[in-house]
A protein has these predicted regions:
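Small-residue-rich helix-loop
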Residues: 3-7, 11
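Active-site metal-coordination segments of metallo-dependent hydrolases
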Residues: 1-3, 19-24
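C-terminal charged capping/lid subdomain of soluble metabolic enzymes
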Residues: 21-101
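Short glycine/serine- and small hydrophobic-enriched flexible loop segments
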Residues: 10-18
């Protein structure tokens, strides 16, 4: 579970950066912290993952934060500056996930 949490936090920072909410330095600081404790920081660490970006998005719909088929993400404007974002363009999300897989 801890590995999934570390990957999720790193992906949230990467997505936040790709959407213009936080800087690359924050992404790097978060990744460096998790790497210091030998925790994974990306999906690339899981070569056997056979989900496409669209399949991942369908699984996101089952997350406890998602309501009425609307995806909800906790994104970041910087370290310690998280916020709820539930208006992500699906095409942007697919493009982001395709890059991360």
């Amino acid at each position: 579970h801890g590995e999934a949490v570390s990957i999720g936090i790193c992906l949230a920072f990467k997505l936040s950066n790709s959407l213009g909410f936080c800087c690359q330095d924050d992404v790097q600081r978060v990744e460096n912290l998790f790497e210091k404790f030998h925790l994974p920081t990306s999906l690339v660490n899981f070569k056997n993952l056979s989900l496409s970006s669209k399949e991942m998005i369908e699984r996101f719909r089952f997350d406890k934060k998602s309501k009425q088929n609307q995806l909800t993400f906790i994104l970041n404007k910087g370290i310690g500056k998280s916020f709820i974002h539930n208006n992500i363009n699906i095409d942007d999300l697919i493009q982001f996930l395709d890059k991360e897989l």
